[in-house]
From Swiss-Prot:
Gene: hisS
Family: Belongs to the class-II aminoacyl-tRNA synthetase family.
Name listed for the protein in its UniProt record: Histidine--tRNA ligase
Localisation per UniProt entry: Cytoplasm
UniProt xrefs under Gene3D superfamilies: Anticodon-binding domain (3.40.50.800), Bira Bifunctional Protein, Domain 2 (3.30.930.10)
GO cellular component assignments: cytoplasm
Highest taxon of the lineage: Bacteria
One GO molecular-function entry: histidine-tRNA ligase activity
InterPro entries: aa-tRNA-synth_II, aa-tRNA-synth_II/BPL/LPL, Anticodon-bd, Anticodon-bd_dom_sf, His-tRNA-ligase, HisRS-like_core, HisRS/HisZ, HisRS_anticodon
GO annotation terms (biological process): histidyl-tRNA aminoacylation
One family name in Pfam for this protein: tRNA-synt_His
EC number annotated for this UniProt entry: 6.1.1.21
Subunit structure: Homodimer.
This protein's UniProt keywords: Aminoacyl-tRNA synthetase, ATP-binding, Cytoplasm, Ligase, Nucleotide-binding, Protein biosynthesis
Length: 428
């Protein structure tokens, strides 16, 4: 007896993107790539798998990501601990060090691709999701911090988004954070009785992250904690003031958020998030900041850097809520045909039209004209090219508009095959 194979479903929190939504993804990525090119950013592609120690060192061993959320396994061939990337910055910095990219000049780079976190799936939070990661490596001044925020404001405008707001903070430099850390630990020790399990665990290892709590019982304690901003020295304040002045010059509104620390340990000086109320609990659309110590931390020569990451699924969700997105057509031209000779001719004509730069679907298989036209209309094609018996005999094609022109301009016309590509292209 043949055993019935139980069908396999996608892993929870790892979603298929089917042809309809995928077309919107492609349009979205086209906008994003054009936007990044306009600021001089070039694409890089790094592996999905990296050595686990890269993320433990780069992100921080006591972060939620490293402690709870990474997909990690042991390589059966050599015993190495490997991890599916939970974010892209560490891998891009690793690549810049390995390939000596910062030897002679700074670089503006970006990457688009999947990342993986072992989380409880919900709207806007998935186990496999996609990021747009943008990094400016080797740039030290607040002008590049400001440019990154301004370029994000431009992206929101390109996408027609309005309900996105900027939150801003400075984390200062390591020595300033050390002084603040000591004061913060004293504050947390005085409130140990109200700390939750995460708070008590992080009180000494990563006290700044305790303030980033979502626990309502700890909010008053967090609000009264010493502010890192009060510990900033002259250089850090000057950097932050320079950033704020440039944002004012660009007309960018923002809210100072002294509790904004981000979930990654490598940040210093500028940190920012773009947030919205339209995505429920997962309201952060984009987050980033400066990480001047990360290149050296991962074994390279000291080099400043700043970057951000956008969650693509969240931004696509927001885009689809904000504007009406036209579903892209499967093709421009759909060829219908009659008989075996018509089918063979259609295949040749399809290739000729593609040579001319047109997107073409040739109806597959044999069917009546009614069924073929139904499929042509469903494809979203503007024009149907008809190769019936008369057309095959006369070496012509009939052109029928499926959408677009009306009246006389929409009338069906017959043209010689030799002129077909030019006529179709003239119809734009």
């Amino acid at each position: 007896m043949t055993q019935v194979f139980q069908k396999v479903s996608a892993i929870r929190g790892m979603n298929d993107v089917l042809p309809g939504p995928s077309a919107r993804w492609e349009k979205f990525e086209e906008i994003v790539r054009g936007w990044l090119r306009s600021y001089g950013y070039r694409n890089v592609r790094t592996p999905v798998l990296e050595h686990t120690r890269l993320f433990a060192r780069g992100i921080g061993e006591v972060t939620d990501i490293v402690e709870k959320e990474m997909y990690t396994f042991t390589d059966a061939l050599n015993g190495d601990s490997l991890t599916m990337r939970p974010e892209m910055t560490a891998g891009i910095v690793r690549a810049s060090i390995e390939h000596n990219m910062l030897y002679d000049r700074p670089h503006r780079v970006y990457a688009i691709g999947p990342v993986f976190r072992h989380e409880r799936p919900q709207r806007g939070r998935y186990r496999q999701f996609h990021q747009i990661d943008v990094e400016a490596l080797g740039f030290a001044g607040p002008d590049v911090d400001a440019e990154m925020i301004v370029m994000l404001a431009r992206l929101w405008k390109l996408l027609g988004l309005q309900d996105v707001r900027l939150e801003l903070n400075s984390l200062g430099q390591p020595a300033e954070r050390a002084a603040h850390r000591a004061a913060l630990i004293e504050h947390l020790e005085r409130h140990q009785d109200i700390l939750d399990e995460d708070g008590r665990r992080r009180m000494y290892s990563n006290p700044l992250r305790v303030l980033d709590t979502k626990n309502p019982a700890m909010q008053e304690m967090a609000d009264s904690a010493p502010r890192l901003f009060d510990f900033l020295g002259e250089e850090s304040r000057s950097h932050f003031d320079g950033l704020c002045q440039r944002l004012a010059d660009a007309g960018i509104e923002y809210r100072l958020n002294p509790r904004l620390v981000r979930g990654l340990d490598y940040y210093n000086l500028t940190v920012f998030e773009w947030v919205t109320d339209r995505l429920g609990a997962q309201g952060t659309v984009c987050g980033g900041g400066r990480y001047d110590g990360l290149v050296e931390l991962l074994g390279g020569k000291p080099a400043p850097a700043v970057g951000f990451a956008i969650g693509m699924e969240r931004l696509l969700d927001l885009w689809e809520q904000s504007v009406e997105i036209e579903q892209p057509a499967e093709c421009e031209v759909y060829i219908v045909h009659q008989g075996e000779e018509g089918q063979r001719l259609a295949a040749r004509v399809g290739e000729q039209l593609r040579d001319a730069g047109l997107d073409v679907i040739v109806h597959a298989g044999a069917a009546g004209f009614k069924a073929q036209f139904k499929r042509a209309d469903a494809s979203g094609a503007r024009i149907a090219v008809i190769l019936g018996g008369d057309e095959v005999a006369s070496r012509t094609a009939s052109i029928k508009h499926l959408r677009g022109p009306v009246g006389a301009d929409a009338a069906q016309q017959q043209v010689p095959l030799a002129q077909l590509a030019d006529v179709l292209k003239s119809k734009g």
